[in-house]
């Protein structure tokens, strides 16, 4: 049976074949209106189809109850889903929870308030015909439910945000997003959820259950969605593309992180020094200067680092090694990030855009300097001569003549200079002397 058959299931007297039964002319049974799947059929449905099936059946029972049918002593929740439990399906959505309100009714229900309409079940009279699938229904309310499925009618509207839903149970579930109600609580850690299915997924964290296996590498996952994301590593699928630079990602979360390059957003701030970072990894790396001993020391200048990788990058400043070469102009760089910035000169990419005037820049530091035009801020102004140096590094270099610091020393005569460019100019004097 396909899910389509469920949508078109007759709500009254399915299985009577238009013929009256001798002993129970005034009875329609529970089995007449509910539909069971075999395990093979159920396995073909995805979770959203299963949820939709349950909601359609729930809506069927509600409409029957509303027009005068009733049950006695028949637990619909157990009866309707008994096959699913028997076949090992342990998931149970909040839609199923809603069926509990019908659990104290009889399997057989009698029609009380509309005997004429009830007689149509056995006479075969079906005055309303469904246009799309030619399904006949015994009364107009049944036809309306069928039509709602075909045209996706959404009569249940949220009075807070106006969002509409095809089923009342969907509306009730949605309303929890406004009220903050979380009726499903984990009995191990106390965390609460708005949906029963979300609680079930959460409980797997405690049980360690990993039901979803990758058929290529055997890796297991707690959630089906995690398995789907993992599979992209095998097929190379990257469905999430940046609309500014075109770079694609396998996960939406990775795309959101990438977009910070364009927006300049830095949500991770160091509580000790106030420095902000676009990535959490950058903040964690930065924190090591406060919490971790710097074990890796440069044997040439004595500078120490928390990570061995940082030491290796630093050593290139002494050796002059530049392993990252631009394949367009051949210029080489000591850091990969420097190569990436350089390549924007060739591509013309300017990912950093000013939110106030729309001007774009190839470097984030250039955007920051530009934004000061709008704000009037001068954070890199020299406190002694009031010169605006534009960036922090330039300010530190500028301050050296004021403080008398001379970091760059000539190895021939010992003379010191505040800037490396001055040292290079000075060295030419020694070179000229050697020629004479």
UniProtKB/Swiss-Prot annotation:
The keyword Zinc-finger applies. GO terms for biological process: regulation of DNA-templated transcription. One of its GO terms (molecular function) is DNA binding. Widely expressed with highest levels in kidney, brain, and liver, and the lowest levels in spleen. Keywords: DNA-binding, Metal-binding, Nucleus, Repeat, Transcription, Transcription regulation, Zinc, Zinc-finger. Residues 28-115 form the KRAB domain. The keyword Transferase does not apply. GO terms for cellular component: nucleus. A zinc finger (C2H2-type) spans 156-178, 184-206, 212-234, 240-262, 268-290, 296-318, 324-346, 352-374, 380-402, 408-430. Belongs to the krueppel C2H2-type zinc-finger protein family. This is Zinc finger protein 120.
């Amino acid at each position: 049976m396909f899910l389509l058959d469920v949508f078109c299931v007759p709500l009254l007297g399915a299985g009577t074949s238009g013929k009256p039964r001798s002993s129970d002319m005034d009875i329609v049974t529970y089995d007449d209106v509910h539909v069971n799947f075999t395990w093979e059929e159920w396995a073909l449905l995805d979770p959203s189809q299963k949820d939709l099936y349950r909601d359609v059946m729930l809506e069927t029972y509600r409409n029957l109850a509303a027009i005068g049918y009733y049950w006695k002593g028949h637990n619909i929740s157990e009866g309707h889903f008994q096959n699913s439990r028997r076949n090992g399906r342990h998931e149970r959505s909040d839609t199923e929870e809603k069926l509990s309100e019908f659990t104290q009714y009889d399997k057989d229900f009698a029609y009380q308030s509309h005997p004429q309409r009830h007689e149509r079940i056995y006479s075969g009279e079906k005055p309303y015909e469904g246009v799309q699938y030619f399904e006949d229904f015994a009364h107009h309310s049944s036809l309306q439910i069928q039509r709602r499925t075909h045209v996706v009618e959404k009569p249940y509207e949220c009075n807070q945000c106006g969002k509409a839903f095809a089923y009342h149970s969907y509306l009730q579930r949605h309303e929890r997003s406004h009220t903050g109600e979380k009726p499903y609580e984990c009995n191990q850690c106390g965390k609460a959820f708005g949906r029963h299915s979300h609680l079930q997924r959460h409980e797997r964290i405690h049980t360690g259950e990993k039901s979803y296996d990758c058929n290529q590498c055997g890796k297991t996952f707690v959630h089906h969605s995690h398995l789907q994301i993992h599979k992209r590593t095998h097929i190379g699928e990257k469905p999430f593309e940046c609309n500014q630079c075109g770079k694609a990602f396998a996960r939406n979360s990775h795309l959101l992180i990438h977009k910070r390059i364009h927006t300049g957003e830095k949500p991770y701030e160091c509580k000790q020094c106030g420095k902000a970072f676009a990535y959490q990894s950058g903040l964690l790396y930065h924190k090591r200067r406060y919490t971790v001993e710097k074990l890796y020391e440069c044997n040439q200048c004595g500078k120490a680092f928390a990570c061995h990788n940082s030491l290796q990058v630093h050593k290139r400043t002494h050796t002059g090694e530049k392993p990252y070469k631009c394949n367009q102009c051949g210029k080489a760089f000591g850091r990969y990030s420097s190569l990436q910035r350089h390549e924007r000169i060739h591509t013309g990419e300017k990912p950093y855009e000013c939110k106030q005037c729309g001007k774009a820049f190839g470097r984030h530091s250039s955007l920051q300097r530009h934004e000061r035009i709008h704000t009037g801020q001068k954070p890199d102004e020299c406190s002694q001569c009031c010169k605006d140096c534009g960036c922090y590094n330039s300010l530190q270099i500028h301050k050296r003549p004021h403080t008398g610091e001379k970091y760059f020393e000539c190895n021939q005569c010992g003379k010191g200079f505040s800037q490396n460019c001055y040292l290079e100019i000075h060295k030419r004097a020694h070179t000229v002397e050697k020629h004479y």
